[in-house]
């Protein structure tokens, strides 16, 4: 008997010291018959803080049953509220609501207590997060604060203060909201709060700082939260701490460490909170996308989606990097259609500007940039934009100005973005702004200035391990050639067709032709380099994609009632970027593709034989034939693709 008492005292004392692992081990060694309802409640807490949610729920259910059997309504209500929060985190909303309703019923007629405050706090969080009723949320948070003062419970006061701060920020009162967050977090730093309250206060503060672009404040509170997590004998909240740490590490440019932290966070959080776990997988995708690990990023975004987070705008930017512009635009546009809260729209609008520009839709890009600027201006602190938000606005504005050939204004916008990102301490974003500034300076005719910016961007990308961005910078500096499959399309006998149809019918026919050809190029992951008279010059990452596009073009035209005859030629070879904005290609590979296109007949798809070696297109090919092409000393072997 004395051994049982000793083990029980050990478990209780360890819980009182917040030595949760020791407490859990001691409770686990005891027979269940030796435990009181209060012991089961402590056992559940120990299980929760050591990352064992299922066991925590089991012990808390036993505690609830014990309190209920003893007629202790307050104890039963307390545990019911905790179980409600447990199930809310794992997205078991019906079960959560059931436990919450049970707690409310049990508290009826009882003297005012902390549990009454927890009910009001839960109602306030529901109004904020689920209903989006901000005035109602503020009223309820204020009620919880006052109740906390009356009963002398500091945790209730500070938790409600944090919730009110987050609500004020979402209402547009950023300065007051951040001030309240700082006040609440100071209480957490000073050790005034219990562990659960401490972790929750830190999380709400850091999330709000990210939402308003105050990266400096987010980094400071993240560091404070990490110190607490590292010192505490807990799991669960450390996963959230790791995730915030990963976000800051990514921003600071330490991507390998950031990915390790984010992956570890997902492992720690998966049994606790589906929403935050989904955010963790999304963060993993963001890190991998920047490093050029597209397969890994795709996998992480897919997992985030499975856990309940729409993986935008990251997935859209991944599709853009893959050359799938239409898919990128559709994904980001759909994601924006699903949200109306400014803070959520703010996250996707910069990407929409970039993708819309790539799709050639200046109208959509301009509208997104205007909305972005309006939202950012509603989140000013001290009458000024935060550096991160100011940088985002100027990048979007610079893209619009660059497209409109306002090169001086574009250079000013990108320079401002570079300076602001430097203030934030974000090397990747700084390098990206420098690359765009280099493009603007080149278009303005300042090649020396452009080279300085592009050199700086390249050095940063290489340090960070941003593979694709490094290649892009090298291309712009003319240091590397790129290997692509180049495709040329051309309308056969266009002059004769114009004479037959007349100007108006020809204009409509040409517009329809352009729509079909451009669309099939983009759908197959190609890049429309430029229009060439009444045809197109396009590039593809690989021959298979080029074949798919060429076949799709011919079939689409064949389905039209009236359509021109088009010939298509292609070749894979080395080339280099040309043009003031490096949007064009030059070199022998391009020249040969153009000559093969000119050698094709009406309705024919003609590829160089070398291009299709091992490509596995799945289409029947003609026997090779040798073509003597202008500008080439030796005949070139070509094959025709049977697309019908």
Spans of model-derived segments:
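Helix-coil-helix junctions within alpha-helical repeat/solenoid scaffolds
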Residues: 2-7, 11-24, 28, 37-40, ...
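Hydrophobic or amphipathic alpha-helical targeting/insertion segments
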Residues: 75-87, 91-102, 116
